[in-house]
């Protein structure tokens, strides 16, 4: 829980050792301490994420930091989002189409579910919210990357309908040709909008445990 002091204390100690241990490894391009933190509070979470960013930069100033991949960013060198809409046109609208009353698309201005804390002030007879934090939204000065998209469910034979045993995103592609067609439409859409987006990462080419969303089988 990134909203607790105890979690922050333990993670900071471990993360410091991780960065120092792997500092010179050539395969590391970007530090990504967190993934999909969607439920931040307004006090401990911003402090914790900022501390991790600062600590990582102090140890290794040479690499960019994607502080919270696909989640609620506070301070970061790369702004990242995750979205698994399967229809390429709908995905384009979500990522790039300006919304009414805004100069940006929804995904640039959205905020995740903030967890407010009710605290009692001394001498006050009822709980009041005394934590207030203005979460940042994307600004074009830093790279914007869709670092998770796709996840196309692909089962060519004997599809399993029980999501506890097998799952992926969207309706299953029943042949490799169906899979490639859907994948191509998504990738082409992103390339056509390359002036806005800096990069993207397809998830994923191989099956993982119960996820059947790759073109390479788990075995």
Task: Walk through the language-model features, giving the residues of each.
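Active-site mouth of glycoside hydrolases
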Residues: 1-90, 99-107, 136-141
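Substrate-binding clefts and catalytic carboxylate motifs of secreted carbohydrate-active enzymes
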Residues: 27-31, 54, 87, 96-219
